[in-house]
UniProtKB/Swiss-Prot annotation:
Pfam families: UPRTase
Coiled-coil residue windows: none
Binding site for uracil: 197, 202-204
Organism: Pyrobaculum arsenaticum (strain DSM 13514 / JCM 11321 / PZ6)
Keyword annotations from UniProtKB, A to Z: Allosteric enzyme, Glycosyltransferase, GTP-binding, Magnesium, Nucleotide-binding, Transferase
Function of the molecule: Catalyzes the conversion of uracil and 5-phospho-alpha-D-ribose 1-diphosphate (PRPP) to UMP and diphosphate.
Keyword Transferase (UniProt): yes
Name listed for the protein in its UniProt record: Uracil phosphoribosyltransferase
An annotated GO BP: uracil salvage
Underlying gene: upp
């Protein structure tokens, strides 16, 4: 399945707190960080592993070695993704980090996105690239970020991480990159005339940084 909904009860609890309009910016940021960590751990479960034997101070034990943790790139879409990526890095502490900065352009009811800054580490076929943005609304911003990834290199695996997605955003991404995996905590049904997710949680960047 290209779309995975994180139905862990604590993830759903955190999402409920984020949706609540009375949640302050500090708790909102903390919630995004915690969700990033949870989603990251769910992603780790999908990595291949092998059994290894290690020597403890008192004997020998069989454990696991996860393969590919040193071949992860996390791309954050500024600025709303910053707390989410902070959590993802807890699960992938050796990840290389990329950044995409984009702005919305609204003209006569039409919403477009302009990338005005992009900086990527090297990307190769052995890498898993995780592109993070709390809100996968129209999919336009995410598509621009993925384009920046492929301008740099072709990853072996591409994963989109969001907190809330919409069918429109999911369809836009998968129609262009059908092998992409999408991890999200919820899928909301609607977009309003400003291209915000309804019911959603509002503007994630503004709420996280009290602007």
């Amino acid at each position: 399945m290209p779309v995975r909904i994180i139905d862990h009860v604590y993830a759903q609890y955190l999402l409920t707190r984020l949706r609540d309009k009375n949640t302050g910016s500090l708790d909102f940021r903390k919630g995004l960080v915690r969700l990033g960590r949870i989603i990251g751990y769910e992603l780790v479960k999908t990595f291949p592993f092998r059994y290894v034997e290690v020597e403890t101070p008192l004997g020998r034990a069989v454990g696991v070695d996860i393969i590919g943790l040193d071949k992860v790139v996390i791309v954050q879409i500024l600025r709303a993704a910053m707390p989410l990526v902070e959590g993802l890095v807890k699960a992938f502490p050796n990840a290389r980090l990329g950044v995409v900065a984009a702005r919305r352009k609204e003209e006569e009811g039409y919403v477009d996105v302009e990338v005005f800054y992009s900086k990527m580490p090297s990307i190769g076929v052995e890498d898993t690239v995780i592109v993070a943005d709390p809100m996968l609304a129209t999919g336009t911003t995410m598509s621009k970020a993925i384009e920046e990834v492929y301008k740099t290199g072709t990853p072996g695996r591409l994963v989109v991480v969001s907190v809330i997605a919409t069918p429109v955003g999911i369809s836009r991404v998968l129609s262009r990159w059908p092998d992409t995996e999408i991890y999200t905590v919820a899928i909301d049904p609607e977009l309003n005339d400003k291209a915000f997710i309804v019911p959603g949680l509002g503007d994630a960047g503004d709420r996280a940084f009290a602007t």
